[in-house]
Design a protein with these regions (language model features):
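Conserved glycine-rich
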Residues: 154-155
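Short beta-strand/loop element within the Bergerat-fold HATPase_c
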Residues: 89-101
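Short conserved segments within the C-terminal catalytic ATPase subdomain
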Residues: 40-55
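Short conserved segment of the HATPase_c
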Residues: 114-126
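A conserved beta-strand-to-alpha-helix junction within the catalytic ATP-binding
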Residues: 20-38, 54
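Conserved micro-motifs of the catalytic ATP-binding
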Residues: 14-19, 59-66
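Short helix-loop "hinge" at the ATP-lid/N-box region of the Bergerat-fold HATPase_c
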Residues: 82-83
């Protein structure tokens, strides 16, 4: 599996720079990905809250310049991790807001959080710190996520939530202008 995952990652990285970017409404992408997880959430008695804050432009969205299917991949991977580490009945929160030049997407869960002293390690290639009962993982998923975010001229950071158990991942992407 590791060789297959690594091979696919290299192909994806090579094709990323050739894919066409376009104006994308990030709210629509998030809603689409959350819809894809709906049955899993029902089966596990978990829920996702989507919170849209700040001013939304006149076209009713937060727009960025990007590759739609790659941004879906980013959101799906981050949600999949949050769902995996959350217990039944826990809530995952996606918050979408803005700064003067960027769109900020924050995903928070109520799982155990990061055991690493430096949570940024999770974005390193081949790094995995999942418990054995989670099955085998290649440690490539979050590295791919980071590469996609950086291709979009964005940043991604991970931290533990303050004063509450859980993880927080923030993705900052430039607004479409």
């Amino acid at each position: 599996r590791l060789i297959t995952d690594y091979s696919q990652m290299l192909k994806d990285e090579a094709s990323l720079s050739r894919e066409k970017m376009s104006k994308i409404n990030l709210i629509e992408i998030i809603n689409s990905v959350v819809e894809d997880f709906k049955q899993d959430l029902i089966n596990q008695n978990k829920k996702i809250d989507i919170i849209v804050v700040d001013k939304i432009d006149s076209n009713n969205g937060y727009y960025i310049f990007g590759i739609s299917n790659r941004l879906e991949q980013v959101i799906a991977n981050l949600l999949d991790n949050s769902i995996s580490f959350s217990q039944n009945t826990q809530t995952i929160e996606i918050t979408l807001g803005e700064t003067s030049n960027n769109v900020l997407m924050t995903i928070k869960d109520e799982g155990p959080g990061f055991s690493e002293t430096s949570p940024q390690k999770i974005f390193k290639r081949f790094y995995s710190n999942r418990p054995k009962n989670f099955g085998k993982h290649s440690g490539l998923g979050l590295n791919i996520v980071k590469n996609i975010v950086e291709l979009h001229k964005g940043t991604i950071t991970a931290s533990n939530r303050l004063n509450i158990k859980g993880a927080k991942v923030e993705v900052l992407l430039p607004k479409y202008s």
